[in-house]
């Protein structure tokens, strides 16, 4: 399971190898995956849409909303950036702590959504325990400013 508090899990070399083996196949189809993940998240947690004021108010047309597509790609690309930085933990920590501060003060996002979105992300890409560890790291760091 994905955790969002406590000490940061450690990605082993085996975890990193498994992620690096699977991720390029997923990232190659990032537009499809990213939109599916965000739409599934908003369907499961409609109240989370309040965190995205630029999205159209018509929930039935979210898949057509260019802002939804843009945000989906932004999220997916951030995950890609983290995966590409797995060997530089300091860089990941700084990047996600800065993003945490921004989500708290600028975007005013409830920190509960990080874990919920991460769970949907991992299940959508059919990720294993190594992805749960990776997203636990992401969630813990995204909650750091809260």
From Swiss-Prot:
Monomer. InterPro entries: Globin, Globin-like_sf, Globin/Proto, Globin_lamprey/hagfish, Mb-like_M. Keywords: Heme, Iron, Metal-binding, Oxygen transport, Transport. GO terms for molecular function: heme binding; iron ion binding; oxidoreductase activity; oxygen binding; oxygen carrier activity. Belongs to the globin family. This is Globin-F1. It comes from Eptatretus burgeri. Residues 10-146 form the Globin domain. Heme b binds at residues 71, 103. It holds the Pfam family Globin. It comes from the Eukaryota.
């Amino acid at each position: 399971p994905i955790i969002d508090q406590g000490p940061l899990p450690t990605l082993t070399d085996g975890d990193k190898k498994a992620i690096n083996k699977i991720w390029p196949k997923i990232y190659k189809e990032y537009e499809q995956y990213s939109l599916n993940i965000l739409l599934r998240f908003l369907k499961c947690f409609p109240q989370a849409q309040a965190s995205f004021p630029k999205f159209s108010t018509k929930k039935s047309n979210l898949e057509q909303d260019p802002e939804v597509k843009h945000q989906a790609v932004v999220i997916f690309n951030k995950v890609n950036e983290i995966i590409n930085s797995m060997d530089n933990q300091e860089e990941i920590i700084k990047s996600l702590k800065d993003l945490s501060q921004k989500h708290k003060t600028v975007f005013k996002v409830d920190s509960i959504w990080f874990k919920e979105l991460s769970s949907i992300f991992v299940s959508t890409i059919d990720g294993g325990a190594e992805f749960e560890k990776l997203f636990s790291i992401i969630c813990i760091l995204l909650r750091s400013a809260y």
